[in-house]
């Protein structure tokens, strides 16, 4: 039995590594930064304001703006999220939005319909209603007397997604966006599926969102209507995972909100940002290659967090860089930002493998365009003597991996807040099919997506293949540089899966995640193939044997560029003053300014019997409290996913209390057919 599991979660620190995917609400405590208190503009804060919509719904907003904005209007920068400005994103909001306001912007945090203090109901992520509401919000902002009429959108993860999606709707007042840790393709590169395989992280994300939507609005802001709003949400709470499991291929559901369907719909300038440790990096090269609008990109070493607070470091002065972008596009100030290379990326040095890195050494490199003309594929061939630069014989080799291969793979979307990154790959490598080079004579650096092409056959109609590119150190330790997943039923694309014919050879192509990494001389480049990668992906119903008859690896080798050394240094990280909180007891924290007490605890468990792929199960439990003085609420959620050969089975429960009185209890027990998974 392989178990990953259980950890307590403390309020304001909501992401144990094993929870897989939680849309980073908090700020890593170990990220050093300069706290700025003296700004060019005095700041006025509007704690709570209603934005009216045409259908009568009101969205709740919190706004920071210069004190004199009514006399000297300023551009607005919108962050539009479902994570509760009051009790969810308060920590990172305090660091970011006053900083923007102090430099001459109206920074606006709006709760999406059905979340936080806003009216209405939320039924799914990235719904058309969410976009329609955003269009009204932007028009409302542009019309305010304190706004110059120019609006930008900035957000990470969900807020990065909807920034791209709303930009594609072309609201006239939206002049530019900054999108962080997002994707242009909701099926190909989001938390739900990877290469047609079901990601375990999608369960963690669905379970987190299931609990997050149970939070009540604050009576101090909305008055006595809080209870009716809360009960209405609880009684209409959707089971998100059931929705997402009902779309196991790239159909119209996933095409909605995927801006890759029409890149040219986006006409405003785009600044795309992510980190190599994050799960959301692959969209950036595609956005650079396919957008027609002005665009820039920045890829650092970071996990899933804003670059001024993210780990692994080094952090940068992201807020200063954001201001340069906004000043250029929202204030028509020539900051020189568009004179710089299209892409700046962190070239990561080789490090000992570990599930947590506080910092990743490296240097900044830059490319004037993407695809970069100076990067060409360097081809290696799979042969009987390993990876070679010339083609040679490969005796067919079979692999049928243990169901426990992948235990050192880390989370699909690391947050850098704990041991959630890939560790030493030697254990997984020992149960995989390996091809590797001799020790390198010279250093090699890659920038972009490695591509692996294989001729394979399976003895079962369904099979997964995990492909890992590793840096093997002289001491034998193995550092994962990149990886890709392919459910072989999806060999011809994500829209039209087809069962394999056992014994028939197929040529498959696996594009690995984009990477920026160095292989030092004396190290070896290793390709590792396995038919399982648990608990990152759900196993096939039968444990297949896949035979490899031949193949190649194309590495995007980047030559040394002397111009890299001439890049101007990025500024050191700065933020506004953090929100003051007081830990009261394990798992409970008080927001001092509001007197609100937030409690969070829970656990997450994954299990598989090494001899039975149908034994896979994931479970998550959350218990959360929100209280102030005599007002007390509590809500608990549980979710469980398991399977048969033909179906995914999903069990869930939610119970909520006001004080000690139960006010709502619901249960779900549903089954979704397995389709080519």
Region spans (language model):
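Accessory cap/linker subdomain of secreted extracellular hydrolases
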Residues: 93-94, 102, 168-265
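Glycine-rich nucleophile elbow surrounding the catalytic serine of serine-hydrolase chemistry
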Residues: 156-165
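Short beta-strand/loop motif that positions the catalytic acidic residue
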Residues: 266, 272-274
């Amino acid at each position: 039995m392989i178990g990953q599991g259980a950890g307590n979660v403390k309020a304001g620190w909501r992401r144990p590594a094993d929870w897989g995917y939680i849309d980073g609400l908090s700020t890593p405590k170990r990220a050093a930064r300069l706290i700025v208190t003296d700004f060019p503009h005095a700041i006025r804060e509007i704690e709570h304001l209603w934005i009216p919509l045409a259908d009568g719904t009101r969205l709740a907003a919190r706004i920071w703006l210069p004190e004199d904005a009514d006399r000297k209007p300023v551009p607005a920068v919108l962050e539009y999220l479902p994570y509760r400005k009051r009790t969810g994103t308060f920590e990172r909001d305090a660091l970011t939005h006053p900083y923007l306001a102090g430099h001459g912007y109206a920074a606006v945090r709006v709760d999406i319909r059905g979340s936080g203090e806003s009216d209405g109901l939320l039924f799914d992520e990235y719904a058309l209603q969410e976009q329609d509401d955003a269009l009204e919000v932007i028009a409302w902002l542009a019309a305010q007397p304190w706004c110059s009429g120019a609006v930008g959108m900035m957000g990470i993860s969900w807020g990065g997604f909807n920034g791209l999606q709303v930009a594609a709707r072309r609201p006239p007042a939206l002049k530019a966006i900054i999108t962080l840790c997002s994707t242009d393709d909701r099926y190909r590169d989001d938390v739900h599926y990877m290469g047609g395989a079901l990601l375990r992280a999608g369960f963690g994300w669905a379970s987190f969102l299931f609990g997050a939507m149970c939070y009540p609005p604050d009576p101090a802001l909305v008055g006595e209507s809080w209870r009716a709003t809360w009960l209405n949400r609880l009684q209409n709470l959707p089971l998100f995972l059931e929705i997402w499991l009902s779309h196991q291929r790239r159909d119209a559901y996933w095409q909605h909100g995927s801006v890759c369907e029409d890149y040219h719909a986006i006409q405003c300038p785009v600044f795309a940002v992510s980190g190599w440790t994050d799960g959301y990096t692959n969209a950036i090269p595609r956005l650079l290659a396919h957008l027609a609008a002005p665009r820039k990109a920045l890829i650092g070493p970071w996990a899933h967090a804003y670059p001024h607070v993210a780990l692994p470091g080094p952090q940068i002065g992201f807020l200063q860089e954001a201001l340069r972008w906004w000043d250029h596009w929202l204030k028509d100030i020539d900051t020189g930002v568009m004179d710089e290379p299209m892409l700046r990326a962190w070239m990561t040095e080789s490090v000992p493998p570990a599930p947590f890195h506080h910092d990743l050494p490296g240097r900044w490199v830059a490319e004037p365009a993407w695809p970069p003309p100076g990067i060409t594929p360097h081809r290696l061939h799979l042969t009987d003597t390993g990876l070679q630069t010339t083609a040679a014989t490969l005796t067919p080799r079979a692999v049928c991996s243990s169901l426990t291969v992948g235990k050192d793979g880390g989370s699909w979307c690391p947050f850098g807040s704990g041991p959630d990154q890939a560790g030493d790959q030697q254990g997984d490598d020992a149960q995989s099919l390996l091809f590797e080079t001799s020790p390198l004579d010279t250093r090699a650096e890659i920038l972009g997506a490695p591509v692996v092409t294989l001729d394979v056959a399976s003895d079962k109609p369904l099979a997964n293949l995990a492909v890992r590119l590793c840096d093997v150190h002289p001491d034998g330790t193995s550092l994962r540089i990149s990886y890709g997943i392919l459910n072989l039923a999806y060999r011809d694309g994500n829209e039209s899966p087809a069962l394999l014919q056992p014994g028939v050879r197929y040529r498959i192509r696996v594009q690995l995640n984009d990477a920026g990494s160095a292989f030092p001389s004396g190290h070896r480049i290793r390709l590792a193939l396995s038919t399982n990668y648990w608990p990152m992906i759900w196993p096939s119903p039968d444990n297949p044997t896949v035979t490899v008859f031949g193949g190649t690896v194309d590495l995007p080798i980047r030559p040394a560029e002397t111009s890299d050394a001439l890049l101007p240094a990025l500024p050191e990280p700065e933020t506004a003053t953090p929100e003051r909180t007081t830990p009261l007891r394990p798992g409970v924290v008080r927001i001092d300014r509001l007197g609100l007490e937030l409690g969070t605890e829970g656990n997450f468990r994954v299990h598989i019997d090494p001899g039975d792929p149908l034994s896979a199960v994931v479970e998550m439990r959350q218990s959360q409290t929100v209280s102030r003085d005599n007002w007390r609420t509590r809500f608990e959620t549980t979710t469980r996913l398991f399977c048969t050969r033909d179906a995914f089975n999903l069990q869930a429960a939610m119970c909520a209390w006001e004080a000690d009185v139960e006010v709502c209890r619901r249960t779900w027990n549903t089954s979704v057919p397995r389709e080519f998974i």
